[in-house]
Amino acid sequence: MRWCWIDRFTELVSGQTASAIKVVSMADEHLHDHFPAIPVMPNSLILEGMAQTSGLLISEYNDFRERVILAKVTKVTFHDRAVPGDTLTYRAKLEAIEPDGARATTTSHIGNRLQAEAEILFAHIDRETADRPLFHANDFGLLLRGLKIFDVGRKADGSKIQCPPHLLEN
């Protein structure tokens, strides 16, 4: 992912749910361009953070071997804006997974307050070119470790999720 709109995962249960956070800071350059003189996190970037949380939950289900991309946002509602000092908590729930894609519901909260909610469809893309990854395996593995997925991630039985060997390659 060239642009990562989450700071770290706080929970992941394989094939079920995930939670991640994004701290909104005055240091974020994109806040100053969206509405001049009113620093606010653009809703499109909040939606992208929600999608990244959901997409990585879906990708983990198959040991990060599927090429998962956002296909369609079927519903999204924003209830409030996010401003510097807010911590967004993204919560994703895997609703369905099929060979060609998946569906997830996701929310964004500021504290206990619902900030946004969405239903998102994802696609597993072109199996014919699966030999060409979206990301270099080692770089993607480093990103996932930086997001703390393997620190907090658990299988449904409670055992710890391990970084797959194919993401440790040089």
PLM regions with names:
Residues 1-41, 161-170:
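Catalytic strand-loop segment that frames the active site of acyl-thioester-processing enzymes
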Residues 3-5, 88, 102:
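Hydrophobic core residues within well-ordered beta-strands of beta-rich domains
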Residues 6, 70-73, 117:
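Hydrophobic residues on conserved beta-strands that form the core of alpha/beta folds
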Residues 7-10, 74, 79, 93-95:
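Conserved positions in beta-strands of structured domains
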Residues 9, 50, 112:
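A residue-level signal for conserved active-site and pocket-lining positions in enzyme catalytic cores
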Residues 14-17, 83-84, 95-170:
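HotDog/MaoC-like acyl-thioester-processing domains
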Residues 35-42, 47-55, 70:
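Compact, glycine-rich, soluble single-domain proteins
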Residues 54-89, 123-125:
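Hydrophobic beta-strand-centered segment that forms part of the acyl-chain substrate-binding groove
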